[in-house]
From Swiss-Prot:
It holds the Pfam family Phospholip_A2_1. This is Basic phospholipase A2 Ceg-N6. Its EC number is 3.1.1.4. It comes from Cerrophidion godmani (Porthidium godmani). GO terms for cellular component: extracellular region. Binds 1 Ca(2+) ion. The active site is at residues 47, 89. One of its GO terms (molecular function) is toxin activity.
Length: 122
């Protein structure tokens, strides 16, 4: 769920999802359109695509199990939905951590109306 995703982001980046990733670029936060602005925004685009594939799941509210050790996140046991949601969140959190050096403050609170490029498909 979103609280667990926030915790994963904190593990991988040492930053809180709010405010750093909730309205970053064109895809971080609710919705998304246009082209991702940078590598961090692409992490959000891919995360949105991952969630879209989970048609019979509730990724924002379903609780899953996971653990971490030395900065490595491991998804635990659970239903197929729980495992897939956890994996979507884990991959995005790792992506944020990988791209931390190229995070740009100018894309924080980025206005949607500037996301005018044609949208990419998943």
């Amino acid at each position: 769920n979103l609280l667990q995703f926030n915790k994963m982001i904190k593990i991988m980046t040492k930053k809180n999802a709010v405010p750093f990733y909730t309205s970053y670029g064109c895809y971080c936060g609710w919705g998304g359109r246009g082209k991702p602005k940078d590598a961090t925004d692409r992490c959000c685009f891919e995360h949105d695509c991952c969630y879209e594939k989970l048609t019979d799941c509730s990724p924002k509210t379903d609780i899953y199990s996971y653990s971490w050790k030395s900065g490595v996140i491991i998804c635990g046991e659970g239903t197929p939905c729980e495992k897939q949601i956890c994996e979507c969140d884990r991959v995005a959190a790792v992506c944020f951590g990988t791209n931390l050096r190229t995070y740009k403050k100018r894309y924080m609170f980025y206005p949607d109306f500037l996301c005018t490029d044609p949208s990419e498909k998943c």
